[in-house]
Amino acid sequence: MIKNVAVGISGGVDSAVTAFLLKNKGFNVTGIFMKNWDIRDETGKCAVEKDYEDARWICNKLKIPLIQVDFVKEYWNEVFSDLIEKYQTGYTPNPDILCNKNIKFNKFFDVALNRFQADAIATGHYANTSFGPYLENYKEDTNVHLLQAHDSSKDQTFFLNQISQETLRHCMFPLGNYLKNHVKTIAKEAGLHKIAQKKESMGICFVGKREFQDFISEYIDDKPGEYIDLDSGLSIGKHNGIHKLTIGQRCRIGGGSKAYYVFNKDQKTNTILAVCNILNEKNQDFIVDKLKFLNHMNNTVSIIQVDSTIHPALYSDFLITQDIHWISEEPRELRCSGVLDCNFRFQHRNPLITCNVYKISDNRLFIRLSVPLRAITKGQVIYGT
């Protein structure tokens, strides 16, 4: 029997309405404010302090207790340090995914259940589970599945792809079946006008109002290297560090008339392979020929088809992935036949692309996409059909 629910209160409208809905359902609700970062902005005002003031105002209005927990050390060690380490190797990780995995659905989960004796946790994420928004369909002997939110424009399941089965079994997502404008209406009806009108936070919490590259440069020293043209193999300029650019991003090369884009980054040589988006017939045929590949699954040869104004090296209709994380378990269809029809996404809000997944080994998958995608990077998510 679920009675006590710990709600992550951020000071925003989504978590406020989450707490309001839970209280109206009759749960004993406790608000938990997570302090993950304490840097001050340009005015000397700590953004966390302002958010905490709003969180306290919300809980006073709803007549529920609010407890602040300090995860600054944990965030530094398990999110920020990991982020910096990966940037130094040339990989561009997603801090929201790291935070959800290691802090919100790990440390917060442990504190809520073990220190505050909560039966479940709840957040203002736009997501659903097979157990229902209030765990009303909870079954002890059944795995829970993460499901997309009703509001596809706000769906946040992409950022929740690394959370564990054990945590998800005790998670409530009351906003999973609501549209964003309805959530704001509920907030106003609940007397939370101040929060309903609050500007939505879209940035990374530790960056503030600064440009991300200016921020990251405080922690990673510049390390100049060469831009190498993929077609010619010649140097076309110098960069200040592979951490400053990601796959598919336009290169910062001064003096040239052509636009170059990052194809790949080599940490060992500190070079960035770049491609130009202006192709003539000769080098286009050469590049496309290099991008032929043998599909070992059905012994056919495929060629990537792309718009001639964009370099085909940036596009791919297949990938091989490893370090797979199944939230529930490996699908029975994949276990039995080695093939799974599903959907693919590698960036938040990108449309789902149909794909076929082939099992190579216990920890490796070959994914064939129905259409070529540009600049695929690490961190892909597959969704059931």
Task: Report the location of each language-model feature.
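ATP-dependent adenylation/nucleotidyltransferase module used to activate substrates
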Residues: 1-161, 188, 262
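AMP-forming adenylation/ATP pyrophosphatase catalytic core
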Residues: 122-128, 133-385
